[in-house]
């Protein structure tokens, strides 16, 4: 039995509120259970120096957590004077995951920065950031298309992510914090709407796992990502 009472293949309730902020070209507040992340997308008519003049666009991301997103206060990284290793790892993951669904030629020589700010954390913040970040990106690109700034849609496939793991010996979908902290195996699965893999992060936390168990987690992830993509499409319809 899961602490939440959910079935093994049951996701937490998902809601996506678009247009949550008025200034960003795209914004979405995604809630997956008690994990809440605000995602905004900003369009800039510039690109990093390493692709300047190439005609290619760029999508990048930044990630952070509010001090009381967790049960005890965390010091702001800006106060500490540097980003932690976890933050850097996660924002790089978000950026490369989102880029996997983008035609950078069609985007043109501009950059879109997706900011993901965790308001409340209860497990799966990086997955929620990727899923909500795609919605913010979709909304920002819609504005480019409406203005005629791009000829064709540069977003070729939705991108979403979900955590799956082995808890109490059972494969489970969408781990919350109590499950994540006790999981024997923990994994993050990033996929496209067409069920193509972008990245899989899996590690044995308390016990090793078999190929069969990995396949079970992959099946759960595919189901979960399908549900998340449906929520993305409903939010941006």
Curated annotation (Swiss-Prot):
Q: What is its EC number?
A: 2.7.7.56
Subunit structure, as described in the record:
Homohexameric ring arranged as a trimer of dimers.
Q: Which source organism? A: Roseobacter denitrificans (strain ATCC 33942 / OCh 114)
Q: Which GO terms describe its biological process?
A: rRNA catabolic process; rRNA processing; tRNA processing
Keyword list (alphabetical) reads: Nucleotidyltransferase, RNA-binding, rRNA processing, Transferase, tRNA processing, tRNA-binding
Name the chemical reaction catalysed here.
tRNA(n+1) + phosphate = tRNA(n) + a ribonucleoside 5'-diphosphate
The record's HAMAP family line, in alphabetical order, gives:
RNase_PH
The record's gene field reads rph
Which protein is depicted?
Ribonuclease PH
């Amino acid at each position: 039995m899961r602490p939440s009472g959910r079935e093994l293949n049951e996701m937490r309730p998902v809601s996506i509120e678009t247009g949550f902020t008025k200034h960003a070209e795209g914004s979405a507040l995604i809630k997956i259970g008690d994990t809440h992340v605000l995602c905004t997308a900003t369009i800039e008519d510039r690109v990093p120096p390493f692709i300047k003049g190439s005609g290619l666009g760029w999508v990048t991301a930044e990630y952070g957590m509010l001090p009381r997103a967790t049960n005890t206060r965390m010091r702001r990284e800006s106060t500490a004077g540097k980003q932690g290793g976890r933050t850097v790892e996660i924002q790089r993951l978000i950026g490369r995951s989102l880029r996997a669904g983008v035609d950078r030629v069609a985007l043109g020589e501009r950059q879109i920065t997706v900011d993901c700010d965790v308001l409340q954390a209860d497990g799966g913040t990086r997955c929620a950031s990727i899923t909500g970040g795609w919605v913010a990106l979709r909304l920002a690109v819609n504005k480019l298309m409406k203005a005629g700034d791009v000829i064709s849609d540069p977003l070729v496939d939705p991108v979403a992510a979900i955590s799956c793991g082995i808890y109490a010996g059972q494969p489970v979908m969408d781990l919350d914090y109590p499950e994540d902290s006790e999981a024997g195996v923990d994994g993050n699965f990033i996929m496209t709407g067409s069920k193509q893999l972008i990245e899989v992060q899996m590690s044995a936390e308390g016990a090793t796992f078999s190929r069969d168990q990995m396949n079970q987690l992959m099946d759960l992830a595919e189901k979960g990502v399908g549900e998340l993509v449906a929520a993305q499409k409903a939010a941006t319809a």
